């Protein structure tokens, strides 16, 4: 074989390998385990490098297409990484004794929308419920005992006039204030999440409000919280939901739209197991709708070989 033919053969082999690496995987969602972000019948795609995904490996809170122990395929979210001590406590994910904080983009994929009371003339919006339960409109027929959710908040779009204005967000005993620029649209997310007081506000450059995700949160959010303070922020709040959640504007501004949200409320396994010590080749995967998901709480941790490809954000 001449050097030219060898080079041509290597080039062809490389092209075939590139096509194989770039094959997008498509999967039709079956079931409610990843609701509300993914609903039955949704078609999800991994993009163009699923094999490269496997080489890179999963990261916490990413959604992956996995092979279950019975050989079926399912989409799940990464909860625990190899060699970690992982547990579920009060509905939250705890790793090494510390509650893991979700970023805004993860919250946008897992949150469940709630109704908010909005008073545009007064520039005020609030989450009126004294108790928030892990109920969902998309699975009312699922027979389960509801539990109290401690993590909830508000999302809003505010519009200012020709003058700068002020914004105040109140969560439990804490108040966060922002100065709003003139002639601007501003998005806000604020509430209690994973044992923290969280908030982020950013300028929305769209001419009009973009469609939100099924969670009720914007499809595009910042990567990190601008406020992430340990809870409790006031006396007597350690074990109680932040029942008082409100936002208010002052000056030349109005609340264009507002809604409530609650976080996913994790539950232990059916047999009561709520903690796992992962070995060097094990991962804990969970569903976004815990009472409708079969995941590591039943299967146990999954080996690295079970992960097929990453599902797009959030």
Task: Report the location of each language-model feature.
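Extended hydrophobic leader/signal-anchor segments used for secretion and membrane insertion
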Residues: 1-314
